[in-house]
């Protein structure tokens, strides 16, 4: 995807999406609970499907129930003490944001050297396939995405500007918009706009 950092954006025609966004925009988040069938397996969120492909032990991502609740085995892998398991799982499940659990698990795998290394292009191609599956199969989420029309989409990451100002670090997946400029590479936003365009094309070609 084309780099987005430094791009000029009309703030009146820009839409932020993230796990805590007000409904229905929260459905655009990868953490949102929605069943994804990918490569012969079923996952409770797009984040689960994506992170599973990066894990040396893909089966770890089958240790969640259909709604993303962690099993005791998965809790152990993530490193949650038993007394914190239910609080963590219940909090994110109530918010329909079970994908955060997949993020926690891959972070643990990275610490243990169990995370596969993929190129930027490989990760983007993987996300394209998974996101297309999400929005093709979930008509409600698809409508939310298509209803953004031609708005500039960006995954809001609050720390983007602070990190850039402090040490020049450019956030890869998300961004902020500051004074009409994108601060961060916003690759997830770019992917979402790519998916939106492709879905529109598919719908227009239907008889």
Residues covered by each model-derived region:
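Charged, low-complexity intrinsically disordered segments
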Residues: 1-207
């Amino acid at each position: 995807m084309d780099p987005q950092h430094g791009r000029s954006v009309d703030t009146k025609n820009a839409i932020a999406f993230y796990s805590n966004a007000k409904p229905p925009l929260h459905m655009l988040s990868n953490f949102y609970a929605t069943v994804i069938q990918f490569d012969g397996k079923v996952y409770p969120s797009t984040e689960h499907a994506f992170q599973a492909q990066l894990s040396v032990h893909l089966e770890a991502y089958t240790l969640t129930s259909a709604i993303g609740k962690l099993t005791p085995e998965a809790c152990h892998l993530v490193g949650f003490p038993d007394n914190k398991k239910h609080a963590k799982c219940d909090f994110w499940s109530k918010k329909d944001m079970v994908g955060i659990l997949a993020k926690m698990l891959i972070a643990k795998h990275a610490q243990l050297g169990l995370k596969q290394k993929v190129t930027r292009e490989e990760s983007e191609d993987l996300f394209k396939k998974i996101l297309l599956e999400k929005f093709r199969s979930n008509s409600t989420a698809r409508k939310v995405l298509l209803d953004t029309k031609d708005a500039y989409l960006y995954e809001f990451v609050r720390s983007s500007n602070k990190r850039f100002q402090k040490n020049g670090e450019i956030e890869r997946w998300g961004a902020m918009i500051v004074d009409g400029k994108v601060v961060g590479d916003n690759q997830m936003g770019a992917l979402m706009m790519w998916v939106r365009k492709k879905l529109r094309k598919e719908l227009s070609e239907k008889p």
